Amino acid sequence: MRLLTRRAGHGAATLALRVIHMQRVPVLRLPAILDMERKIPSRESPRRLSAKPGRGTEMKKLARPLGVVAADSDKDSGFSDGSSECLSSAEQMESEDMLSALGCKREDKRRQPSKAADTALPTLPPMVVMKSVLVKQGSSSSQLQSWTVQPSFEVISAQPQLFVLHPPVPSPVSSCQTGEKKSESRNYLPILNSYTKIAPHPGKRGLNSEDRGTSGVSKKLCTERPGPSLSSSEPAKTGRVLSSPSTPAPPSSKLTEDSTLQGVPSLGAGGSPQTLQPVSSSHVAKAPSLTLASPASPVCASDSTLHGLESSSPLSPLSASYTSPLWAAEHLCRSPDIFSEQRQNKHRRFQNTLVVLHKSGLLEITLKTKELIRQNQATQAELDQLKEQTQMFIEATKSRAPQAWAKLQASLTSGSSHSGSDLDTLSDHPDV
């Protein structure tokens, strides 16, 4: 909507509002507020003019929200000389206050960029351009209600001044909250390397100083080990011992026997090197299924003990390398004559996994679980055989046939669960 103004002569402020309604025209958006220039009123016309009641009602209709249009055709609002009406002192002071308020709004509007006004208010009501007219606005407590209330218009006795009435712009989002959110987003970093790698790739693994020292000691022990290297059958045998814990003797006892047969000194519980005595088969059978993870075992030696013995005597790290449960894996990983480079990498990764499992205690749990599974399977087989023999005994008791007793006796003879005295008792008393 566009408002055209015309001015009458001889210092009398006359208003002529011409309203042109153009259909399907987008709502105009406001630029920055124009600079206001207050001029000294003329001395020749001391009387102040005011608007007539009919003129005020028309202007109220024009200033309603969403720009209510009066008519489609051009309309003249008439003239108003206002010769007998003057502004009171209270109204004059109020008009000055409103001028200062408009000046403050003009400065605030200059600070805001033009893009903010375009994006914040995509649909603005029509713009009203007036000359020598002051809008009486309500209290500026709420910005939304200040435009919904119908304003009143007053004519001031001054030179024609240009005012642009615009709806209040909503206050932008406080920059403090946005800055705090941005700072929080900048300070937040994802947790890197939260979980340890069980078996990292040799080229990508990251070891700390202790792990690097331990690996360096093991490499030095394996490379500087005197004497002829083991043949291809010996590491294969040792690998079978480590991979199959279902055998009666544990892998630690196998390694202990090998070290005893070769006459290599090993570490005792107190940390001093000593020579192991030959272990008989009965002691090996009565020994616990896993001794490599116990802290008081001669086979288990901590990393600090290995470092201390390496600095004190040259033979103690050698014995620790033989008695360590990981010696076979280290030997398999560092035998270039037997394995190719690709298989060495695989075995090195297997060694890393074995070391981590041994330190965390999972290796001990796994070996104990496998041993319990083996014992459970053996016990289950014995229970099945006992059930079968019980069924045969019930049938022989009911039928009292010599063939059933002979079959039961053959089953008991082939089984290892009963002794010979029990067989003699069953044969002597067939009617039991």
From Swiss-Prot:
Give me the ranges of the annotated region Disordered: 71-98, 194-315, 408-432
Tell me where in or outside the cell this protein is found. Answer: Nucleus; Cytoplasm, Cytosol
What keywords is this UniProt entry annotated with?
A: Biological rhythms, Coiled coil, Cytoplasm, Nucleus, Phosphoprotein, Repressor, Transcription, Transcription regulation
Indicate the secretion signal residues.
Answer: none
Q: In which tissues is it expressed?
A: Expressed in the heart, kidney and liver and shows a circadian oscillation in these tissues with a peak at circadian time 14 hours (at protein level). Expressed in the brain, including the suprachiasmatic nucleus (SCN) of the brain, and in multiple peripheral tissues such as heart, liver and kidney. Exhibits a circadian oscillation in the peripheral tissues with a peak at circadian time 14 hours.
Pfam families to which the protein is assigned, alphabetical: CiPC
Q: What does this protein do?
A: Transcriptional repressor which may act as a negative-feedback regulator of CLOCK-BMAL1 transcriptional activity in the circadian-clock mechanism. May stimulate BMAL1-dependent phosphorylation of CLOCK. However, the physiological relevance of these observations is unsure, since experiments in knockout mice showed that CIPC is not critially required for basic circadian clock.
Q: Supply the name of the protein.
A: CLOCK-interacting pacemaker
Organism listed in the record: Mus musculus (Mouse)
- Gene of origin? Cipc
